[in-house]
């Protein structure tokens, strides 16, 4: 696939309008997606490639499904694994592709699964249900885990819970995949921390808030017992004042990390920011 780009689009299948994952060839010069095929997955709500790019993982009703990415970009199903919880909403993997982390929005659960040498999904290593109440009874008053990923040094697993306005910090044991709570970052009430990411140099930590509609930037340092974070900036996720229907969704870097992109539901916009990698 040298010099060739593919796009894999996950979709809810319960409506009957989609089968799960749609595979497209990408014509970069023309700026077009060219339909190739569909792969059946029950409600593929989130996709994540392995660190080596050889495997594609999908959320599914049964838990997680693993696909091998073939040389031509097509997908071949490897296996699936149950997570003993409701369907997840976000996936991330360890740098060496030994573990995959599943965020459970509906049941407030973080699940850790082993990954096998061939990339297939293994057994459950650990799972924790969050407890507590949030501040918005009409919407998010109970735990809703929305994003989880390892810190740059992979000593900790950080887990965003937009229902209780917290980012929990778990110590991660690479030997057996077990997690243990060591700290909690308490966010502003009714802010709903939905998504976060780290700069590749490990110096900065970015948090996107769904209801507050802002991005907060933190400095990040490796602490002996817990990570050390300090807020340095807050900026709106939209170019104008958000309306009541606006909800910040996701956030990503450009490949060179000189820009940050943020998508917003409700007003259906994408915001782009210049990024200073020194500050």
Q: Locations of the language-model features?
A:
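Surface loop/turn motifs at the tips and blade-to-blade linkers of beta-strand repeat domains
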Residues: 37-42, 80-84, 129, 138-140, ...
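Loop/turn-rich, solvent-exposed surfaces of beta-rich toroidal or solenoidal domains
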Residues: 246-279
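Conserved beta-strand positions in repeat-built beta-propeller and related beta-rich domains
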Residues: 9-15, 58-61, 102-105, 159-162, ...
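Short coil/turn segments that connect the beta-strands within blades of beta-propeller domains
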Residues: 4-5, 52-54, 96-98, 153-155, ...
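Asp-box/WD-like beta-propeller blade repeats and closely related beta-sheet repeat scaffolds
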Residues: 76-147
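Short loop/turn segments immediately following beta-strands, especially the blade-tip
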Residues: 24-30, 67-74, 113-122, 171-178, ...
């Amino acid at each position: 696939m040298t010099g060739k780009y593919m796009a894999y689009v996950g979709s809810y299948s319960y409506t009957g309008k989609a089968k799960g994952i749609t595979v497209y060839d990408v014509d970069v010069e023309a700026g077009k997606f060219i339909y190739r095929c569909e792969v059946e997955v029950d409600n593929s709500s989130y996709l994540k490639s392995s660190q080596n790019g050889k495997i594609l993982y999908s959320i599914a009703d049964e838990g997680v499904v693993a696909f091998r990415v073939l040389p031509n970009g097509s997908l071949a199903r490897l296996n699936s694994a149950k997570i003993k919880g409701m369907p997840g909403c976000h996936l991330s993997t360890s740098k060496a592709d030994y573990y995959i982390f599943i965020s459970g929005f509906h049941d407030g659960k973080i699940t850790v699964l082993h990954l096998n040498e061939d990339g297939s999904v293994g057994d459950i290593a650990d799972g924790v249900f969050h407890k507590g109440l949030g501040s918005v009874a009409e919407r998010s008053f109970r735990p809703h885990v929305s994003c989880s990923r390892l810190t740059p040094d992979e000593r900790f697993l950080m887990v965003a819970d937009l229902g209780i306005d917290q980012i929990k910090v778990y110590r991660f044991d690479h030997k057996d995949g077990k997690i243990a709570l060591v700290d909690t970052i308490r966010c502003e009430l009714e802010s709903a921390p939905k998504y976060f990411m780290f700069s590749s140099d490990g110096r900065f930590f970015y948090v996107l808030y769904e209801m507050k509609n802002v991005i907060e930037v933190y400095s990040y340092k490796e602490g002996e017992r817990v990570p050390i974070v300090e807020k340095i900036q807050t900026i709106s996720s939209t170019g104008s004042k958000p309306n009541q229907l606006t909800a910040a969704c996701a956030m990503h870097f450009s490949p060179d990390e000189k820009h940050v992109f943020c998508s917003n539901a409700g007003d259906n916009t994408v915001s782009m920011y210049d990024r200073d990698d020194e500050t």
